[in-house]
Amino acid sequence: MRYREIILSIPKEIAENFTSFLDEVGVVGYYEILFDREVPRAPDEEIISDDTKFRVYLAEEDKENETKILIFLKATAGESFFLESRWIETKEYEEAYKEFYKPFIIGSYRVIPTWEKDTALGTTPEGIFPLLVNPGLAFGTGHHETTRLVLGRMGDLNLSAKRIADVGTGSGILSLAAAKSGASLILAIDVDPNSVRSASFNRDENEISSEVLVVEEGGFDHKKIQEQTWDLLIANITFAVLKANIQKIASIKTDHFLFSGVITERKEEFLELLKNTVGGEGVFFREDTGWELIEWKRKG
């Protein structure tokens, strides 16, 4: 089987809308190319480019979506984007993202691609939790700023014996981190069946019990999410999805939230939504190249 690989470079300010568009039209998969190095960017280090790079994959029989993508970019970015495409075989598709995905440390965790575990596990520093991850078609390599922000904060929190809900789990990377940090129960859910399969695979790769890390399909209205009580809710999801589900978020039985996936331009609007609908206040904030981490508590 063949796939159509579309290589893109687009203005960063339209990246969130672009991913929402891809989710809406339905593509085989996509991922965002960001950092590819062991050491995170220093606070005063120059950002080389304001563009965001994507690779998008279409099924061989998909005759429409490449044109739709081009029309979307013309309408939103004008001439300020680069696009090229090619046919690739299944094996190339499965291997493509590995070129850009290497082990790296963020906070208390070292993210290790599953295909590098034989060499990388032995070099992980003492006191650092290794997270074996194969993202497959799911979001969550750990390279994206939003995932880095959440991992960095999770390392500062006491998660031992906590009950944690991870909505929009993607590859399951944040749930893996919670399990390695001693959480007693993690419910990882995602509306994308590919993510459910990916998170389940990564759980097993890390030898985490399915009784500790439960992976299921669903969203904020998932029965277990709504009916059970949680010590922490993690949602690394775009602002548009968070806004659309704010009432469901407010009804979840937890007083502690970690949100990421919100761009700086939408931060104040999201904080106002939280204040008016969820109640409580922000207790910790961190920004990374235009993406925001918001830790929110209903009780001060």
Swiss-Prot record:
CDD domains noted in UniProt: AdoMet_MTases
EC number: 2.1.1.-
Disulphides: none
Group of enzyme by EC: transferase
Alphabetized Pfam families for the sequence: PrmA (PF06325)
Binding site for S-adenosyl-L-methionine: 147, 168, 190, 236
GO MF term list: protein methyltransferase activity; protein-lysine N-methyltransferase activity
Family affiliation: Belongs to the methyltransferase superfamily. PrmA family.
Name this polypeptide is given: Ribosomal protein L11 methyltransferase
Species of the source: Leptospira interrogans serogroup Icterohaemorrhagiae serovar Lai (strain 56601)
